[in-house]
Curated annotation (Swiss-Prot):
It comes from Saccharomyces cerevisiae (strain ATCC 204508 / S288c). Belongs to the MDM10 family. It is found in: Mitochondrion outer membrane. It comes from the Eukaryota. This is Mitochondrial distribution and morphology protein 10.
Amino acid sequence: MLPYMDQVLRAFYQSTHWSTQNSYEDITATSRTLLDFRIPSAIHLQISNKSTPNTFNSLDFSTRSRINGSLSYLYSDAQQLEKFMRNSTDIPLQDATETYRQLQPNLNFSVSSANTLSSDNTTVDNDKKLLHDSKFVKKSLYYGRMYYPSSDLEAMIIKRLSPQTQFMLKGVSSFKESLNVLTCYFQRDSHRNLQEWIFSTSDLLCGYRVLHNFLTTPSKFNTSLYNNSSLSLGAEFWLGLVSLSPGCSTTLRYYTHSTNTGRPLTLTLSWNPLFGHISSTYSAKTGTNSTFCAKYDFNLYSIESNLSFGCEFWQKKHHLLETNKNNNDKLEPISDELVDINPNSRATKLLHENVPDLNSAVNDIPSTLDIPVHKQKLLNDLTYAFSSSLRKIDEERSTIEKFDNKINSSIFTSVWKLSTSLRDKTLKLLWEGKWRGFLISAGTELVFTRGFQESLSDDEKNDNAISISATDTENGNIPVFPAKFGIQFQYST
């Protein structure tokens, strides 16, 4: 389940018209969400509230071998945050959990081509207005969190410098480990490219990220299928100035919709040349209540590979649809007595007297469009050829919009998430839903590998719900055991 402060951060981006889908950090967010979702490792309780329209608080408790907790505070001067924030009772489940990310390629436009976009998309209009607005107001966000009993601290500051630029500062401080790390981000988003310059005090790490969108300009036809597809290529480069250790990777992402069903799908291909790691993912919405993802990893140096699968199954609320259907069945037809359809009535005669004869009006129009026969035949052939293509494109767009509207109008009550890996031989199960105003997440991670307990670190062993002895593992008495189990409750007002 998405933490409360992450919901506030997402609302801040929405209110300031900052798109996170162009970030290279989130280029593989869909596959990570479906495969690497987090399993609670203990009993966790989070209570949050909005004290003022600009301040938010959150209190966390967890029982992981001992009672731990944290206190968070967030302040933002962005206006209309309440339009994007909802409490745990009113928020839709698909907005409160991490799930398949549907991209909006229409948002990827440059300033020069912004005038060519359709005015039907209100989000595009808002972004276009923001780009050309000379009265841009700088907005800020301040976040702090303190953990206890460890007294660790973390903080974040976000400053919108202009409609296209943003500055971010993150810091972590640990008194126990004598660790103090400060990371600075400067981001520039031109909607065709998003560039990030990063500097961290840890090892004096310097980084650069860039993401370029290829399919950004709509075609001449506003109903073109290209408005629902996008191709993005990104890369990142790192260098530690102290240890002189480099790092780099590149990723290609393609997002589109099925022309027959309108269901979205995302494909990514990542490559790390230094470590020889290649990763490819395929994610698709197989239905309004189901999602599937597959990932294949391969290393060129060690010749090792891995295949992972993930899926989601959503449960809808059906009684509202049945109620509307019953109400529609009770509607009675309009009685003929309410409409005067007598041709001899005075109202009908007055209507015929005032309405002109359209046939005579058409005949009175002079014939100024006399076209030769061969040109008329060529025009008819072109009209027939293009009309069939445009009709097909319009049908595809209608199918895509119907599928998206069906998902947005659905009311989901719970979701099951499953993920497995053939090399690690693990199975993760997670259930998320709503109950009496609470957002609940409960899950477990099942392990099928012997000797798994010995491969864990001391912290991971303490996080396990059940401790398995080495004797039982070697004898095969417990071939399958839960390596992690927990439940999380969230409540916000």
